[in-house]
Amino acid sequence: MPTMIKKDDKAMEPPNEKPHRKIERDDVPESSNHIPPPESGVLKGGKVNSKTRALKAVTSIIADADENPQKKVNNETNGVQKQKTEDLSKRIGKFEYLFYKFLLVLLYICFGLFRYGQYQYNKMKLRIFSIIYNHAYTPQLIRQDVIPLKKIPKRLAAILEVKPVGDVGGGVTGLLNDASEIVCWTVSAGIKHLMLYDYDGILQRNVPELRMEIHSNLAKYFGPAHVPNYAVKIPHSNKIFYNLDGIETETDVGNEIEANQEKDKIAIEISLLSNRDGRETIVDLTKTMAELCAVNELSVSDITMDLVDSELKQLVGPEPDLLLYFGPSLDLQGFPPWHIRLTEFYWEKDNNEVIYSVFIRGLRQYAGCKVNVGK
């Protein structure tokens, strides 16, 4: 049996070397990439085996264990209170929504009832005025309504619009009839200048039909043998259509002598306007003046307010003294803005018909108004 050789520990040590020293835990350097666990934060800053640090660590753990249940209870209490607050806010918000909705509906109903009453009142007033001011297709009755007035307009304008075809007096035929009725009232009142404005220019495109309608209604008012002479003027196309003793003729505006001779014989001059005669005319005039200035045919110093005013009067016509609108609320619909600086407006609320009572009441209002130029 082989003999076990017992080696001496000292003999195993390499020569000339110091004996190994026991390495303590705190002497081992930590890696720079090492992420310590959360618990090591309590032990940071000194030796682990120090009694003070160990006592602090144990105390901190015990304190955390005592605080966690208290925090949990507080969090649960706060959650319950927050939930109650949210529920209360939802209930209050729903109540406010229902309250304001009810208030809005109530206000809407009150306004609707008020507006309905106002509409019926205005309609009843118009019916009463229609009974009081009834011309009965007689020029003498119209003259009797006009004679008491202190003054009447020299130039009258009216804004007309096309109604739906399905309505009474709708379509192009209704528009032509309304225009001819206003012409008859104007002639009977002794007014010699009338402007008829419709936005789309339907009257300008239907001049032959309009002249026939005017002649027919004038014959109804004055009799077939005493139809007044009239002239229909279209400023945009520089044309004037005359009707003399039932004979219709067409005269170009450029023929001044013939136009002036026939103008003295007519009872009324009717100008047909559209949106083309409004702002577009002012723009075209401005472009023309700019082109003349560019070629030195017109000096900038020559462009004055009087020049612009005279040119617009020649292109569109003079400014009317009274403007009638046969609609529920005033809507100028692009009427030439240059020509209404001193014009008196008149319309009846909730009215959408061309009726004589609006015409004569407009004249009565003009007779009582005072125009202060520049004051």
Curated annotation (Swiss-Prot):
SUPFAM superfamilies: Undecaprenyl diphosphate synthase (SSF64005). The keyword Magnesium applies. Residues 1-28 have a biased composition (Basic and acidic residues). GO terms for molecular function: ditrans,polycis-polyprenyl diphosphate synthase [(2E,6E)-farnesyl diphosphate specific] activity. Its EC number is 2.5.1.87. It comes from the Eukaryota. One of its GO terms (biological process) is protein glycosylation. Changing residue 372 to H: Loss of function. It is found in: Endoplasmic reticulum membrane; Lipid droplet; Nucleus membrane. Pathway: Protein modification; protein glycosylation. Residues 1-48 are annotated as: Disordered. Its cofactor is Mg(2+). It is a single-pass membrane protein. The keyword RNA-binding does not apply. Keywords: Endoplasmic reticulum, Lipid droplet, Magnesium, Membrane, Nucleus, Transferase, Transmembrane, Transmembrane helix. It catalyses: n isopentenyl diphosphate + (2E,6E)-farnesyl diphosphate = a di-trans,poly-cis-polyprenyl diphosphate + n diphosphate. GO terms for cellular component: dehydrodolichyl diphosphate synthase complex; endoplasmic reticulum; endoplasmic reticulum membrane; lipid droplet; nuclear envelope; nuclear membrane. The chain crosses the membrane at residues 97-119. With SRT1 or RER2, forms the dehydrodolichyl diphosphate synthase (DDS) complex, an essential component of the dolichol monophosphate (Dol-P) biosynthetic machinery. Adds multiple copies of isopentenyl pyrophosphate (IPP) to farnesyl pyrophosphate (FPP) to produce dehydrodolichyl diphosphate (Dedol-PP), a precursor of dolichol which is utilized as a sugar carrier in protein glycosylation in the endoplasmic reticulum (ER). Forms an active dehydrodolichyl diphosphate synthase complex with either SRT1 or RER2. Belongs to the UPP synthase family. This is Dehydrodolichyl diphosphate synthase complex subunit NUS1. It comes from Saccharomyces cerevisiae (strain ATCC 204508 / S288c).
